[in-house]
């Protein structure tokens, strides 16, 4: 029988951005595989928090907007903090969706939540 929230230990899993692949399709496949392992833990009663990096992904978003801005004249460049938020959003969405799909398939009634962080640029004068 699936465990209810709070019955087991709590763990934090840190996924580096490089662990998520180099293309959107590769990332989706790796996220689905990772979700299975996370749900294994949840099924064993573990409360899981997942933290992830986004270095390669934010770089790809930033480069794509820079390329579009340079080549079509209509697309503005994306500021780096906003590109970071975009990458956090889509990585969080893919992770949550994959985890929720696996939880549902196993009959485990748990939910997910995503938190987008903000990049602060401090200038010392």
Predicted regions and their residues:
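A glycine-rich helix N-cap at a beta->alpha junction
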Residues: 72-90, 96-97, 101
């Amino acid at each position: 029988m699936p465990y209810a929230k709070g019955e087991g230990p709590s763990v934090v899993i840190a996924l580096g951005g490089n662990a998520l692949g180099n293309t959107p399709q590769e990332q989706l496949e790796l996220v689905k595989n990772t979700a299975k392992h996370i749900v294994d833990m949840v099924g064993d009663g573990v409360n899981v928090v997942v933290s992830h990096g986004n270095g390669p992904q934010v770089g790809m978003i930033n480069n794509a907007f820079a390329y579009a801005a340079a080549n079509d004249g209509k697309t503005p460049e994306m500021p780096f903090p906003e590109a970071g938020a975009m990458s956090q959003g889509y990585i969080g969405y893919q992770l949550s969706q994959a985890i929720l799909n696996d939880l549902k398939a196993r009959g485990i009634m748990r939910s997910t939540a995503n938190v987008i962080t903000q990049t602060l640029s401090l200038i010392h004068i």
